[in-house]
A protein has these predicted regions:
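Extended amphipathic alpha-helical segments with heptad-repeat/coiled-coil character used for oligomerization
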Residues: 290, 294-325
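A glycine- and small-residue-enriched flexible loop/hinge signal that marks low-structured segments
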Residues: 1-243, 252-281, 287, 295, ...
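Generic "edge-of-domain/loop-turn" microfeature
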Residues: 55, 282, 301-305
Protein backbone atom coordinates (compact mmCIF):
# COMPACT_ATOMS: atom_id res chain seq x y z
CA UNK A 1 0.00 0.00 0.00
CA UNK A 2 1.41 3.39 -1.03
CA UNK A 3 2.13 5.90 1.76
CA UNK A 4 -0.11 8.92 2.19
CA UNK A 5 1.83 12.07 1.34
CA UNK A 6 -0.97 14.62 1.20
CA UNK A 7 -0.84 15.65 4.88
CA UNK A 8 2.04 16.24 7.31
CA UNK A 9 2.45 13.77 10.17
CA UNK A 10 3.31 15.21 13.59
CA UNK A 11 5.49 13.05 15.82
CA UNK A 12 5.23 13.40 19.59
CA UNK A 13 6.32 11.66 22.76
CA UNK A 14 9.68 10.49 21.49
CA UNK A 15 12.96 10.58 23.41
CA UNK A 16 16.52 11.35 22.37
CA UNK A 17 17.86 8.10 23.77
CA UNK A 18 20.12 9.62 26.41
CA UNK A 19 18.36 8.09 29.41
CA UNK A 20 20.89 6.42 31.67
CA UNK A 21 23.89 7.82 29.79
CA UNK A 22 26.47 9.04 32.31
CA UNK A 23 30.10 10.14 32.13
CA UNK A 24 31.04 6.58 33.09
CA UNK A 25 29.06 5.37 30.05
CA UNK A 26 30.95 7.79 27.81
CA UNK A 27 34.32 6.65 29.19
CA UNK A 28 33.38 3.01 28.74
CA UNK A 29 35.67 0.05 29.28
CA UNK A 30 38.98 -1.05 27.78
CA UNK A 31 38.17 -4.76 27.73
CA UNK A 32 36.37 -6.75 25.05
CA UNK A 33 33.79 -5.70 24.10
CA UNK A 34 35.27 -2.20 24.24
CA UNK A 35 32.77 0.53 24.91
CA UNK A 36 32.65 4.32 25.10
CA UNK A 37 35.92 6.11 24.42
CA UNK A 38 37.85 2.86 24.27
CA UNK A 39 35.91 1.80 21.17
CA UNK A 40 38.24 4.24 19.37
CA UNK A 41 41.29 2.07 20.08
CA UNK A 42 43.23 1.34 16.86
CA UNK A 43 40.52 3.11 14.85
CA UNK A 44 42.93 5.72 13.34
CA UNK A 45 40.56 8.52 14.39
CA UNK A 46 42.25 11.94 14.24
CA UNK A 47 40.24 13.77 16.92
CA UNK A 48 37.37 12.90 19.24
CA UNK A 49 35.18 14.21 22.03
CA UNK A 50 32.83 12.62 24.54
CA UNK A 51 29.78 14.84 24.28
CA UNK A 52 29.32 17.06 27.35
CA UNK A 53 31.47 14.89 29.63
CA UNK A 54 32.05 16.93 32.78
CA UNK A 55 33.95 14.66 35.19
CA UNK A 56 37.28 16.42 35.64
CA UNK A 57 38.86 13.30 37.13
CA UNK A 58 38.51 11.61 33.71
CA UNK A 59 40.65 14.18 31.87
CA UNK A 60 44.01 12.62 32.70
CA UNK A 61 42.85 9.21 31.44
CA UNK A 62 41.49 10.81 28.28
CA UNK A 63 44.80 12.58 27.62
CA UNK A 64 46.75 9.37 28.18
CA UNK A 65 44.44 7.46 25.83
CA UNK A 66 44.74 10.14 23.14
CA UNK A 67 48.54 10.01 23.37
CA UNK A 68 48.61 6.21 23.14
CA UNK A 69 46.37 6.26 20.05
CA UNK A 70 47.90 9.30 18.29
CA UNK A 71 44.61 11.19 18.58
CA UNK A 72 43.59 14.54 20.05
CA UNK A 73 40.81 14.85 22.61
CA UNK A 74 38.71 18.02 22.31
CA UNK A 75 36.71 19.06 25.37
CA UNK A 76 35.16 22.17 26.88
CA UNK A 77 34.54 23.29 30.44
CA UNK A 78 30.97 23.63 31.81
CA UNK A 79 28.54 26.15 30.36
CA UNK A 80 29.13 29.70 31.60
CA UNK A 81 32.57 28.90 33.02
CA UNK A 82 35.13 31.59 33.81
CA UNK A 83 38.71 31.79 32.57
CA UNK A 84 40.21 31.51 36.04
CA UNK A 85 38.08 28.49 36.85
CA UNK A 86 39.01 26.78 33.56
CA UNK A 87 42.70 27.44 34.24
CA UNK A 88 42.31 25.96 37.71
CA UNK A 89 40.52 22.94 36.30
CA UNK A 90 43.32 22.26 33.83
CA UNK A 91 45.89 22.37 36.61
CA UNK A 92 43.89 20.30 39.11
CA UNK A 93 43.15 17.69 36.44
CA UNK A 94 46.85 17.32 35.70
CA UNK A 95 46.38 18.33 32.07
CA UNK A 96 49.74 19.15 30.52
CA UNK A 97 49.78 17.35 27.21
CA UNK A 98 49.66 18.24 23.50
CA UNK A 99 47.00 15.57 23.04
CA UNK A 100 44.20 17.45 24.82
CA UNK A 101 42.52 20.64 23.57
CA UNK A 102 40.63 22.32 26.41
CA UNK A 103 38.13 25.04 25.44
CA UNK A 104 36.58 27.54 27.85
CA UNK A 105 32.89 26.99 28.56
CA UNK A 106 31.75 30.12 26.74
CA UNK A 107 29.21 27.97 24.91
CA UNK A 108 28.19 28.63 21.34
CA UNK A 109 24.82 29.35 19.76
CA UNK A 110 23.90 28.12 16.29
CA UNK A 111 20.67 28.52 14.36
CA UNK A 112 18.61 25.42 13.69
CA UNK A 113 16.90 26.52 10.49
CA UNK A 114 14.69 23.42 10.28
CA UNK A 115 13.07 24.01 13.65
CA UNK A 116 13.52 27.78 13.61
CA UNK A 117 15.32 28.01 16.95
CA UNK A 118 18.78 28.96 18.20
CA UNK A 119 20.50 26.16 20.08
CA UNK A 120 23.22 26.40 22.73
CA UNK A 121 25.94 23.77 22.34
CA UNK A 122 29.29 22.77 23.75
CA UNK A 123 32.04 24.58 21.76
CA UNK A 124 33.96 21.33 21.36
CA UNK A 125 31.57 20.54 18.50
CA UNK A 126 32.99 23.50 16.57
CA UNK A 127 36.51 22.45 17.56
CA UNK A 128 35.91 19.02 16.04
CA UNK A 129 34.33 20.64 13.01
CA UNK A 130 37.11 23.10 12.22
CA UNK A 131 39.99 20.62 12.53
CA UNK A 132 38.01 18.17 10.43
CA UNK A 133 38.09 20.75 7.65
CA UNK A 134 41.76 21.72 8.02
CA UNK A 135 44.79 19.79 6.83
CA UNK A 136 46.98 18.82 9.80
CA UNK A 137 49.61 21.55 9.34
CA UNK A 138 46.92 24.22 9.72
CA UNK A 139 46.05 25.75 13.10
CA UNK A 140 42.42 26.68 13.90
CA UNK A 141 43.62 30.07 15.19
CA UNK A 142 41.74 32.93 13.48
CA UNK A 143 39.85 30.57 11.14
CA UNK A 144 36.16 31.47 10.63
CA UNK A 145 33.80 29.18 12.54
CA UNK A 146 30.92 28.64 10.16
CA UNK A 147 27.53 28.36 11.81
CA UNK A 148 28.29 30.11 15.10
CA UNK A 149 25.74 32.88 15.61
CA UNK A 150 26.72 33.92 19.15
CA UNK A 151 28.38 32.81 22.37
CA UNK A 152 27.17 33.22 25.93
CA UNK A 153 29.51 36.15 26.47
CA UNK A 154 28.78 37.86 23.16
CA UNK A 155 25.04 37.59 23.84
CA UNK A 156 25.63 39.44 27.10
CA UNK A 157 27.71 42.06 25.29
CA UNK A 158 30.93 40.94 26.97
CA UNK A 159 34.19 41.01 25.03
CA UNK A 160 37.53 39.62 26.19
CA UNK A 161 40.03 42.04 27.67
CA UNK A 162 43.69 41.89 26.66
CA UNK A 163 44.48 40.49 30.10
CA UNK A 164 41.91 37.72 29.68
CA UNK A 165 43.20 36.80 26.23
CA UNK A 166 46.73 36.72 27.60
CA UNK A 167 45.58 34.26 30.28
CA UNK A 168 43.96 32.11 27.61
CA UNK A 169 47.07 32.11 25.43
CA UNK A 170 49.50 31.33 28.23
CA UNK A 171 47.28 29.06 30.31
CA UNK A 172 46.84 26.06 28.04
CA UNK A 173 43.19 26.70 27.18
CA UNK A 174 41.25 28.18 24.27
CA UNK A 175 38.01 30.08 23.75
CA UNK A 176 35.79 31.39 20.96
CA UNK A 177 36.25 35.10 20.28
CA UNK A 178 33.43 37.35 19.04
CA UNK A 179 33.59 38.87 15.54
CA UNK A 180 34.82 42.28 16.67
CA UNK A 181 37.88 40.63 18.24
CA UNK A 182 38.85 38.20 15.49
CA UNK A 183 41.93 39.78 13.89
CA UNK A 184 41.28 38.72 10.30
CA UNK A 185 37.65 39.64 9.78
CA UNK A 186 34.18 39.83 11.23
CA UNK A 187 33.61 36.22 12.30
CA UNK A 188 33.75 34.00 15.37
CA UNK A 189 37.10 32.25 15.76
CA UNK A 190 39.29 30.43 18.25
CA UNK A 191 41.50 32.70 20.31
CA UNK A 192 44.66 30.67 20.87
CA UNK A 193 44.74 27.47 18.80
CA UNK A 194 46.73 25.96 21.67
CA UNK A 195 46.51 22.60 23.36
CA UNK A 196 46.98 22.06 27.09
CA UNK A 197 50.76 21.55 26.98
CA UNK A 198 53.09 23.93 28.82
CA UNK A 199 55.86 23.10 26.34
CA UNK A 200 56.02 26.13 24.03
CA UNK A 201 57.52 23.99 21.27
CA UNK A 202 54.53 21.65 21.33
CA UNK A 203 51.50 23.66 22.47
CA UNK A 204 50.00 24.43 19.06
CA UNK A 205 47.11 22.38 17.70
CA UNK A 206 49.09 22.01 14.46
CA UNK A 207 51.90 20.31 16.41
CA UNK A 208 49.52 17.70 17.76
CA UNK A 209 47.84 16.97 14.45
CA UNK A 210 51.03 16.97 12.35
CA UNK A 211 52.77 14.72 14.85
CA UNK A 212 49.82 12.33 14.87
CA UNK A 213 49.63 12.43 11.07
CA UNK A 214 53.31 11.59 10.65
CA UNK A 215 53.19 8.88 13.33
CA UNK A 216 50.30 7.22 11.53
CA UNK A 217 52.28 7.52 8.30
CA UNK A 218 55.24 5.75 9.90
CA UNK A 219 52.85 2.94 10.82
CA UNK A 220 51.27 2.79 7.36
CA UNK A 221 50.99 -0.29 5.17
CA UNK A 222 53.80 1.03 2.96
CA UNK A 223 56.17 1.17 5.93
CA UNK A 224 54.77 -2.07 7.26
CA UNK A 225 55.73 -3.85 4.04
CA UNK A 226 59.31 -4.01 5.34
CA UNK A 227 58.28 -6.41 8.09
CA UNK A 228 59.43 -9.90 7.10
CA UNK A 229 62.05 -8.74 4.62
CA UNK A 230 65.74 -9.59 4.85
CA UNK A 231 68.54 -7.22 5.90
CA UNK A 232 72.28 -7.67 5.51
CA UNK A 233 75.39 -6.01 6.93
CA UNK A 234 76.41 -4.84 3.45
CA UNK A 235 76.67 -1.04 3.02
CA UNK A 236 74.46 -1.17 -0.09
CA UNK A 237 71.71 -3.27 1.48
CA UNK A 238 68.56 -2.85 -0.62
CA UNK A 239 66.12 -3.13 2.27
CA UNK A 240 67.60 -0.13 4.06
CA UNK A 241 67.99 1.85 0.84
CA UNK A 242 64.37 1.25 -0.13
CA UNK A 243 63.16 2.19 3.36
CA UNK A 244 65.10 5.45 3.16
CA UNK A 245 63.78 6.10 -0.35
CA UNK A 246 60.20 5.59 0.87
CA UNK A 247 60.50 8.24 3.59
CA UNK A 248 62.59 10.60 1.45
CA UNK A 249 59.96 10.42 -1.27
CA UNK A 250 57.11 11.00 1.14
CA UNK A 251 58.94 13.93 2.74
CA UNK A 252 59.47 15.48 -0.70
CA UNK A 253 55.75 15.18 -1.36
CA UNK A 254 54.93 16.81 1.97
CA UNK A 255 57.27 19.70 1.19
CA UNK A 256 55.63 20.24 -2.20
CA UNK A 257 53.17 23.15 -2.48
CA UNK A 258 50.84 20.88 -4.43
CA UNK A 259 50.52 18.48 -1.48
CA UNK A 260 50.12 21.43 0.88
CA UNK A 261 46.87 22.20 -0.97
CA UNK A 262 48.52 25.19 -2.62
CA UNK A 263 48.19 27.34 0.51
CA UNK A 264 50.46 30.38 0.16
CA UNK A 265 52.78 28.38 -2.08
CA UNK A 266 53.76 26.15 0.84
CA UNK A 267 53.78 22.44 1.50
CA UNK A 268 52.94 20.65 4.72
CA UNK A 269 56.49 20.66 6.14
CA UNK A 270 59.54 22.89 5.82
CA UNK A 271 62.83 21.99 4.19
CA UNK A 272 65.27 20.41 4.66
CA UNK A 273 64.39 17.07 6.24
CA UNK A 274 66.60 14.14 7.22
CA UNK A 275 66.21 10.39 6.80
CA UNK A 276 68.89 8.00 8.08
CA UNK A 277 68.66 4.26 7.53
CA UNK A 278 72.09 2.67 7.11
CA UNK A 279 74.71 0.79 9.10
CA UNK A 280 75.23 3.73 11.47
CA UNK A 281 71.84 3.10 13.10
CA UNK A 282 71.53 -0.57 12.12
CA UNK A 283 74.68 -2.29 13.41
CA UNK A 284 74.96 -6.09 13.07
CA UNK A 285 74.07 -6.66 16.74
CA UNK A 286 70.68 -4.97 16.33
CA UNK A 287 70.08 -6.64 12.98
CA UNK A 288 70.57 -9.99 14.70
CA UNK A 289 67.68 -9.11 17.03
CA UNK A 290 65.38 -8.37 14.08
CA UNK A 291 65.43 -4.58 14.20
CA UNK A 292 65.42 -2.10 11.33
CA UNK A 293 65.87 1.49 12.52
CA UNK A 294 65.07 4.59 10.47
CA UNK A 295 65.62 8.09 11.88
CA UNK A 296 63.27 10.68 10.39
CA UNK A 297 63.50 14.40 11.19
CA UNK A 298 61.17 17.04 9.78
CA UNK A 299 60.61 20.70 10.60
CA UNK A 300 57.00 21.85 10.85
CA UNK A 301 55.80 25.15 9.42
CA UNK A 302 55.42 27.85 12.07
CA UNK A 303 52.10 29.55 12.77
CA UNK A 304 52.11 33.36 12.66
CA UNK A 305 50.69 34.35 16.02
CA UNK A 306 52.03 37.87 16.39
CA UNK A 307 52.13 40.35 13.50
CA UNK A 308 54.26 43.18 14.87
CA UNK A 309 54.55 46.43 12.92
CA UNK A 310 57.17 48.86 14.21
CA UNK A 311 55.92 52.31 13.25
CA UNK A 312 57.37 55.78 13.41
CA UNK A 313 55.78 58.76 11.73
CA UNK A 314 55.95 62.52 11.73
CA UNK A 315 57.12 65.52 9.79
CA UNK A 316 60.53 65.44 11.42
CA UNK A 317 61.19 61.69 10.99
CA UNK A 318 64.40 60.68 9.24
CA UNK A 319 63.80 57.44 7.36
CA UNK A 320 66.51 54.81 7.80
CA UNK A 321 66.53 51.13 6.91
CA UNK A 322 66.80 48.96 10.02
CA UNK A 323 69.24 46.13 9.44
CA UNK A 324 69.21 44.74 12.97
CA UNK A 325 66.56 42.03 13.41
CA UNK A 326 64.46 42.12 16.57
CA UNK A 327 65.29 39.73 19.41
CA UNK A 328 62.63 37.67 21.21
CA UNK A 329 63.68 39.30 24.49
CA UNK A 330 62.35 42.62 23.19
CA UNK A 331 58.81 41.32 23.00
CA UNK A 332 56.27 41.07 25.80
CA UNK A 333 53.66 38.32 25.93
CA UNK A 334 51.36 39.23 22.99
CA UNK A 335 47.87 37.86 22.47
CA UNK A 336 47.48 36.94 18.81
CA UNK A 337 46.62 40.36 17.44
CA UNK A 338 47.90 42.55 14.68
CA UNK A 339 49.53 45.51 16.37
Amino acid sequence: MAPTLSAPVTLAGGTDGDAGVTDATLMGQDIVPRKGMYAFRNSLVDCFTLCDLSTIADYAAIGAFALSESMMGIFASPSGDTINNALGTRISAGLDTPWFWYILGDWTYWYDAFNGVSRLSNPSMFGIGIVGNLSPQQNPLNKPLQGVSATQRSTAGQTYSDTELSLVNTGGIDTVKPPQQSPGGYYFSFASGRNSSSNTAANGIEYTRMTNFLIRTAKSKAAGSFIGRLQSIQPNDQTRQQAKALFDGFSAQLASPMVGLGLNGQGMIDTPWSVVCDLTNNPPALQALGYLFLYWQVRYLNVVRYFVVKFMGGGNVTVNVQNTPPAPQQLANPINVAA
